[in-house]
Amino acid sequence: MASQNTEQEYEAKLAPSVGGEPTSGGPSGSSPDPNPDSSEVLDRHEDQAMSQDPGSQDNSPPEDRNQRVVNVEDNHNLFRLSFPRKLWTIVEEDTFKSVSWNDDGDAVIIDKDLFQREVLQRKGAERIFKTDNLTSFIRQLNLYGFCKTRPSNSPGNKKMMIYCNSNFQRDKPRLLENIQRKDALRNTAQQATRVPTPKRKNLVATRRSLRIYHINARKEAIKMCQQGAPSVQGPSGTQSFRRSGMWSKKSATRHPLGNGPPQEPNGPSWEGTSGNVTFTSSATTWMEGTGILSSLVYSDNGSVMSLYNICYYALLASLSVMSPNEPSDDEEE
């Protein structure tokens, strides 16, 4: 009985419906698979969903191009690049509308408001510059040698900034290597000036020490001269005084005091041996006889000998302190 009922149900399914077409629930030439694959079922559902809504892909919101991280120089992170190279890269990219080149390609034009929203307000992995403030960004431009040029006086350019640098040009990335931060240049200059400073100090100290040593040696020589001057000057001065006095006595008998100096062309001459003082004329003898020259001879003789001794000992001390191995000023420099 069960088999007959099954055959009747199967024949009813195969019976043609009105119009000669099989019923909607009947099989189409093959028996259905009692255990269909689950992957095939999922594929059928996805195909049905796509057929029901064919415009679903087209209606998805497009990705904002300005929110993408630009891949520069073999996909390196843009945030790790230097400031000039970051700026040059975003100017070269058409993605950013807030920055662009001028007509000559030697200056960058920046829209203040749009640049603030488009570039500086980026967060997280999409961040490009370390600062999010326009004032700090302008300060960075100045530190890297960018100069601001005034745009035209048209009302539409009030929010535009134009900055230029001789090493910041369109399609010339190699020039960016010449752009350096000002504080880095200042530190390099300071290091260059610090090199000869210790040598200069040593030279000054060496010259000063030699000068002090020479001064002390001269002072000692002067003291030696002052201590030895009376013993040297005494006998010669006394001798000259005695001889001048004796000569004055002899000349006093020959020439009275009221008479003037004699005019004898071939008169006797006498050379003294005390202190390099020579009396060679009778006029000098007459001055000695009158007592005018006797005191002057002693004082002049002593001062000349004292000056001679001072100069001699000072020169001797200077020569003694100078060693042959001492470098000259030119060699020290």
From Swiss-Prot:
SUPFAM superfamilies: Winged helix' DNA-binding domain. Residues 49-60, 228-242 have a biased composition (Polar residues). GO terms for cellular component: nucleus. The keyword tRNA-binding does not apply. InterPro entries: HSF_DNA-bd, WH-like_DNA-bd_sf, WH_DNA-bd_sf. Belongs to the HSF family. PANTHER family: HEAT SHOCK TRANSCRIPTION FACTOR, HEAT SHOCK TRANSCRIPTION FACTOR, X-LINKED MEMBER 3-RELATED. This is Heat shock transcription factor, X-linked member 4.
